[in-house]
Amino acid sequence: MLFTVAWASLAAMFSFSIAMVVWGRNGDGTLKF
């Protein structure tokens, strides 16, 4: 159970960071940090 939760959170953070990089390179401007 604990391993599954940890793996799910790790995958979520990884995909989120990938999405941030993609959006950042897109030059959309709506999401700027």
Curated annotation (Swiss-Prot):
Predominant cellular place of this UniProt entry's protein: membrane
Subunit structure of this chain's protein: The 4 large subunits of the cytochrome b6-f complex are cytochrome b6, subunit IV (17 kDa polypeptide, PetD), cytochrome f and the Rieske protein, while the 4 small subunits are PetG, PetL, PetM and PetN. The complex functions as a dimer.
Statement: the UniProt record of this protein carries the keyword Thylakoid: yes
Gene Ontology MF annotations: electron transporter, transferring electrons within cytochrome b6/f complex of photosystem II activity
Residues spanning the membrane: 2-22
Record bears the keyword Transmembrane helix: yes
One Pfam assignment: PetN
Annotated protein name in UniProt: Cytochrome b6-f complex subunit 8
Compartments it resides in: Cellular thylakoid membrane
Sequence similarity: Belongs to the PetN family.
Purpose of the protein: Component of the cytochrome b6-f complex, which mediates electron transfer between photosystem II (PSII) and photosystem I (PSI), cyclic electron flow around PSI, and state transitions.
GO terms under cellular component: cytochrome b6f complex; plasma membrane-derived thylakoid membrane
Membrane topology: Single-pass membrane protein
Organism of origin: Synechococcus sp. (strain CC9902)
GO BP: any one term: cytochrome complex assembly
Keywords: Electron transport, Membrane, Photosynthesis, Thylakoid, Transmembrane, Transmembrane helix, Transport
